[in-house]
Amino acid sequence: QGEILLEYADRILALSEDAARAVSESLGDAGEIRLCLRSSAVLVSNVLKDFIHEHPHVSFSISSEPKGCDLLIDSVSSAYDIPDNAHLLMTEEICLAVSSSHPLAHTGHISVEQMMDEKFIDLADTPSYAGVFNSIFSKCKKTPQIAYSCNDYILQGKLISLGLGVSFVASVTWTSSSLPENISLLHIDDCPHFRSIYYQPLGSFCSENQRIFEHQLEEYFKNLNN
């Protein structure tokens, strides 16, 4: 019974907060957008920069946990897996990033068998990366060596460019980022993988500023796809 009461208390509190925010907006308060950002931080930061420039009085709080947030931005391995009330922003191919000096760099593609002898650069504490890695090598008797582990995509790119290892990357996100140019992306021939980026409104209240931000998100990703 206690859990049921707590659940309803949380709902009532959330509704009260939404009502207070709606009143504040009607009085001209620009307010805050509470964003849960679990994917595509590099791309979303570009949208944030433009939005804040145009709407300097709107503030953002960014979290990795959805509770208490207005908007979730995340990715899944298939567009079929996005939540019912979510909006698909983009689907992009997962490729293998290698140094331009890599023997297969000029071919543009690689097989799973050819990847077995590669030294990989792991992205630590990134469930989506671990999911791709495990999925691709799930049917293999062994997995490739993890040569380095880092939690910074910039460091990851530097290590790849130096020829110290290879890594799986999201193709559009990678090519849209300011990363080393001497890196080639290889298509995975026999085990293609993709990821779908989406946004999902979380609260019952959606401010006008949030609607504008969502629209700018859609426009930005639409332009990336063109």
Go through each PLM region and give its residues.
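Alpha-helical "hinge/linker" immediately C-terminal to small N-terminal DNA-binding modules
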Residues: 1-25
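Short beta-strand->loop
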Residues: 85-94, 171, 180-194
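A late-sequence structural motif
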Residues: 183-226
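Flexible hinge/capping segments at coil-to-helix
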Residues: 82-94, 98-120
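Short helix-loop capping/hinge motifs at secondary-structure junctions, enriched
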Residues: 80, 101-111, 191-193, 203-210
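Hydrophobic hinge/microswitch elements
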Residues: 68, 126-184
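Secondary-structure junction motif
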Residues: 104, 118-140, 207-208, 224
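Central regulatory/effector-binding core of bacterial HTH transcription factors
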Residues: 29-81, 150
